[in-house]
Amino acid sequence: MKKFTCVQDIGDLKSALAEAFEIQKDRFKYVELGRNKTLMMIFFNSSLRTRLSTQKAALNLGMNVMVLDINQGAWKLETERGVIMDGDKPEHLLEAIPVMGCYCDIIGVRSFARFEDRDFDYQETILNQFIQYSGRPVFSMEAATRHPLQSFADLITIEEYKKTARPKVVMTWAPHPRPLPQAVPNSFAEWMNATDYDFVITHPEGYELAPQFVGNAKVEYDQMKAFEGADFIYAKNWAAYTGDNYGQILSKDREWTVSDRQMAVTNNAFFMHCLPVRRNMIVTDDVIESPQSIVIPEAANREISATVVLKRLIEGLE
Ligand SMILES: CCC[C@H](NC(C)=O)C(=O)O
Ligand SMILES: NC(=O)OP(=O)(O)O
């Protein structure tokens, strides 16, 4: 594997899952593979799970690890080409990227959507500059339009907990005080559409995701109807994608907050969320603390998804 930015990069899902469950049984099985190989993790945005689980995955494989928070300690970076750099940014990304590539073997990048220009975000400008100019294999630690390490962990978790071959999986929008990226819902939808699950997306009108991610999923504007008979509930907030509303909050309707009311019409569904989660905005205390909440095993599987991805990137090194 030469990059990991989307579901297509992992190839056949059944073999990726087999590898994940093998590593889950013995996460140090390939501890020699990464000897004298260096992972560089670059964060343009905050992180807890991605930062810790990806570092742990690298250690599982015997790698050296370097972590850089671009906005703390490094020079402020200009990212636009053609800009006269007479402002507060002393360095351009187009120099910084190949320099960082000199010091490592594999690069992970977190760079969220900026919500200033939809094309800039949806062309994955920052991530693609790392792919083009670093000279190293690059993987996404959540970029502008996807979060594949999260989605792979979500799939592993559903496969672990499902009680039927083709579970009904419902992704529901929920309210949040800030406009959050579409990367997690886009990516979850992309991975769910790559399975044979019964996948439904539910959100208020105006929160339609980009069609290339919705794919063949059923979209249901009535949340209670969507929840009927569900086996898994995946809750997430996202800002509007469509038209002039890009990056905007259209609703903070707390009727969409996942509570016992909605969970009561499911098939005793498991509750999932990528975390961090705003309690009593996205989900009530009772639901996220219930025996059906699997948000912690879901977060634990981030170590497994990252170990599989790093293993395949190391194996792909010349
Ligand atoms: C894994 C989630 C990261 C980010 N969450 C926040 C709070 O910014 C998001 O919603 O994309
Ligand atoms: N789910 C996830 O990626 O969490 P962090 O933003 O804390 O890394």
Curated annotation (Swiss-Prot):
One of its GO terms (biological process) is citrulline biosynthetic process. Its EC number is 2.1.3.11. InterPro entries: ArgF'-like, Asp/Orn_carbamoyltranf_P-bd, Asp/Orn_carbamoylTrfase, Asp/Orn_carbamoylTrfase_sf, Asp_carbamoyltransf_Asp/Orn-bd. It comes from Bacteroides thetaiotaomicron (strain ATCC 29148 / DSM 2079 / JCM 5827 / CCUG 10774 / NCTC 10582 / VPI-5482 / E50). The keyword Transferase applies. The lineage of its organism: Bacteria, Pseudomonadati, Bacteroidota, Bacteroidia, Bacteroidales. The record marks 90 as: Key residue in conferring substrate specificity for N-succinyl-L-ornithine versus N-acetyl-L-ornithine. Catalyzes the transfer of the carbamoyl group from carbamoyl phosphate to the delta-amino group of N(2)-succinyl-L-ornithine to produce N(2)-succinyl-L-citrulline. Is essential for arginine biosynthesis. Has no activity with either L-ornithine or L-aspartate as substrate. Also has no detectable AOTCase activity, being unable to convert N(2)-acetyl-L-ornithine to N(2)-acetyl-L-citrulline. Pathway: Amino-acid biosynthesis; L-arginine biosynthesis. Gene3D superfamilies: Aspartate/ornithine carbamoyltransferase. Belongs to the aspartate/ornithine carbamoyltransferase superfamily. SOTCase family. It catalyses: N(2)-succinyl-L-ornithine + carbamoyl phosphate = N(2)-succinyl-L-citrulline + phosphate + H(+). The keyword S-adenosyl-L-methionine does not apply. It is an enzyme of class 2 (transferase). This is N-succinylornithine carbamoyltransferase. The gene is argF'.
